[in-house]
Amino acid sequence: MTKKTSLKGKKAALLRLGSYLFRHKLYVITAFALMLASNLLALLGPSLSAKAINAINLGVGKVDMDTVTKNVILMVIVYAASALMSFLLAALLVKLGQKITYTLRKEVFDHLLTLPAGYFDTHQTGDIVSHISYDIDTVNASLSHDLLQICASVVTVAGSLGYMLSISPVLIGVFAVTVPISILFTRYKTKRTRPLFKRRSAKLGELNGYAEEMLSGQRTIRIYGREADVCNRFDDRNAQSCDAYYEADYHGAIIGPGVNFINNLSVSLVTLIGGIFFMLSLTGTLPPASIMFLNLGDLSAFVQYSRKFAGPINEFANILADLQSALAAADRIFGILDTAPETEDSENAVTLTNVKGDVEIQNVTFGYDEEKSVIKDMTVSVPAGSVTAIVGPTGAGKTTLINLLMRFYDVNEGSIAVDGRDIRDYTRDSLRKAYTMVLQETWLFGGTIAENIAYGKDDATREQIEHAAKQAHIDGFINTLPDGYDTVITDNGVSISKGQKQLITIARAFLADAPMLILDEATSNVDSRTEKNIQSAMRSLMEGRTCFVIAHRLSTIKEADNILVMRDGRITEQGTHDSLMEQGGFYASLYNSQFDTAE
């Protein structure tokens, strides 16, 4: 059962890969025609060579120079034409390969943007990047070359077999002795190599994921002096990746030499037996009418055709090794493409417009794993234009609540409503555009500062961009830069301080001008002067908007209209700062501990 399933999986993967190839039918048809012409022309060479050699008439002392000259000239023409066809085919395959790579990368990347947030929570960024780069390159190398090469091998093998049969049926029997051995050896080795190539791809993805994770946190690594530990962990993963590469490539590489050795034995046997036939024919022991009669030209042609026959079989073994690698990479690529995207908006979904900002959370229960709830029976009413702060220890469910508000995940039980309507009745796009977010982990892309500020509003004018920067108190810093707003940010903005990056994202939020706002620990880990600028910008940004604020620095949320204290997924306390301090509960103790620490 497992074997049948495996075979079906291979066939399905090959057919699916082939569908990408045949999207470019004109290229494929042209490539096939060039391949066919090149191989058929090359097959004429040994036959012409045989005629030229036979025209020498060994043992008679006469040479038919006209026949020799004619066939030599034809050989030059045939081989030159075959080489030209091969050159054109190679150029065409490069172009075809690029088209396939473009299509695959576009499909994978576009699909990634439709996947639910949970996919990115459970997959390393470096591993995903490995799919888009290495795996697609591996598939392309096999798809644009190996499949056509298999067709070329079939033509060469069939043509060579036909010529060999016409020359000496007896030698065909001699040659065929080793063919089953070659086929069985190839089949045995390829069966063992595919799991090794899958492991190789997986280990490379793990290595890339770890490298990406560590490089993005290299400052933290240095602060805590963890360089040696990180290097050791990288060495372990690197060694595992190299071991996986060695095992896969070693077992894949020995297929070709093994098959080549078997084929060389076959050719040696043919040459030996054929030589005996030729000597017996030359001395007259074998009459021309004998099925074993053989002259020198025919023996030469037979050996050449046996080489041509064996060559594709040897190449086929190497191609199979490449296909094992390609199928392993394809499994990973199709794993992305087959991952279900976010659930589609309902057919009756409406666009959220004219947003007031009333939010009602009713009896909401949610867990990333349905058996373990992160938020439990939460009920909260958030009036339009109010500021709701969310505090609590790590793992209390604060960030999860934000994920639910934005519909990165849907609730397991209960409902969340905006302006009196369940958010599942709105289109996701319109719901998310109703919010703007300022996160602790700021994200700046490779582009100018102006482009980063305008990220949430494509049609923003320079005047609007500069006004947003002034509102965020970042305009002065930007103008100190040599290129001002046209300064290019690289490497995710590493040349800009954390506070300045947060101010740029606040400017982005000002420009987006959404009616609802989410601030996720936006003032953590910045100096006091920058924090004052951020707090001033925040107060302006929050005016007139429904705001949800997550912060560990409780001093920053004293002015919130309502503070939700979360512990273990439940709201344990709720009220204004003053009322919560009067209660003397968990919030008060948390606030006092931070205040005492600050003292």
Name what the model sees in each region:
Residues 28-88, 92, 165-170, 281-296:
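Transmembrane helix-loop-helix hairpins at lipid-water interfaces of multipass membrane proteins
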Residues 23, 117-118, 136-143, 147, ...:
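An intracellular "coupling" helix at the cytosolic face of ABC transporter transmembrane type-1 domains
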